[in-house]
A protein has these predicted regions:
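C-terminal subdomains that position terminal phosphate/3'-OH groups for nucleotidyl transfer/ligation
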Residues: 1-160
Length: 160
């Protein structure tokens, strides 16, 4: 485990996982003179730990994003020490999710959307995220479906 994982486990143990651990992390950053890299890793692990506790309420796309994150292993290590049954449940779920790919290659990019006629805007990022979530959920299974879905999502953003 990383230094940030050890700090996160210590912080959760001392301040319980119900406390505002991000506020505590800010205080510890100052007191322990943590580097930006370690502090960001600590915050990420703490966030992932909180999300893991809500695992069964999360959608497939969110679960896959968590499982594919660089620091999921650290958050899982903490969960394993805290709640063995919960850890086993989530680990099995991740193994099942891996069968369909945790972080597959995106079917489309912003360049594809521009080529399809969408005007350059900040909305393109939101459209791409929605399309990728649909891809992770399994409701979009090809490049063509992704482009079609993207146009529909863009229209919804434009109309709202």
């Amino acid at each position: 485990s990383s230094y940030a994982t050890a700090l996160a486990a210590w912080m959760i143990d001392r301040h319980t996982s119900e406390a505002n651990v991000h506020e505590v992390a800010s205080q510890w950053r100052i007191q322990l003179l943590l580097s930006n890299r370690v502090y960001e890793e600590l915050r990420t692990i703490l966030s992932l730990h909180q999300e893991l506790s809500l695992w069964d309420t999360l959608g497939t796309a969110k679960q896959k994003r968590i499982a594919a994150s660089d620091h999921c292993i650290g958050a899982l290590a903490i969960m394993q020490a805290e709640d063995r049954a919960g850890f086993v449940h989530i680990k099995r779920a991740i193994t099942h999710l891996e069968q369909t790919g945790l972080a597959p290659e995106h079917f489309i990019s912003g360049h594809d959307l521009l080529e399809a006629g969408l005007p350059p805007s900040s909305t393109i990022g939101n459209v791409l995220e929605a399309v990728y979530d649909a891809q992770l959920e399994g409701s979009v299974t090809s490049r063509e479906e992704a482009l079609s879905f993207a146009m529909m999502v863009y229209q919804e953003f434009k109309d709202s």
